[in-house]
Amino acid sequence: MSAVPEYFGSLVFDDRVMKAKLPYDVYVSLKKTMYEGGTLDTAVANAVADAMKEWAVEKGATHYTHWFQPLTGSTAEKHDSFITPSPDGGVIMEFSGKELIRGEPDASSFPSGGLRATFEARGYTAWDPTSHAFIKDKTLCIPTAFCSYGGEALDKKTPLLRSMQALNKQTLRCLLYTSPSP
């Protein structure tokens, strides 16, 4: 049996894994996005997706999912495969930055109890890089926020992220107002 320190966190794409798997400039850009917000450059997103896929496949994963907590009170997942059949009968392992960052353009397939018609249920998942991806049951789970195309929160994470952003902004404003001038 393995010792706990050997396997604890071994299925999490955390800072240790990012440092080991990502080129330095990609790692720095990703960390900047995590701390300051904003969008990832396409090249950075592709490099992160490739490193994440390679790491997940090394750990036995064949699929990935955009994982989130909708307002139904449970978790929801949209599964896709890294595997694409090739013309010669083999397989191609693919996972792009676009697939990492954004998922499911049609929210009607998620657990909503059939409350909306398909044309009314437009929503999408967006990767939250501040939460680490992890592997569960040979599936790479990518933590995401779930929003409507109009920007309304359709999950429990989006309001939390927005609250953290608002608190950070106002705290910095108060600190600037109350701190002595140099």
Language-model features, listed with the residues they occupy:
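Charge-rich interaction surfaces and accessory domains that mediate macromolecular binding and assembly
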Residues: F119-L176
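Histidine/acidic residue-rich metal-binding segments in metalloenzymes
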Residues: A3-G97, I101-F119
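Short, functional N-terminal and low-complexity linear motifs
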Residues: M1, K19-A20, A51, S131-L140
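Conserved small/polar residues in nucleotide/adenosyl-binding loops
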Residues: Y177-P182
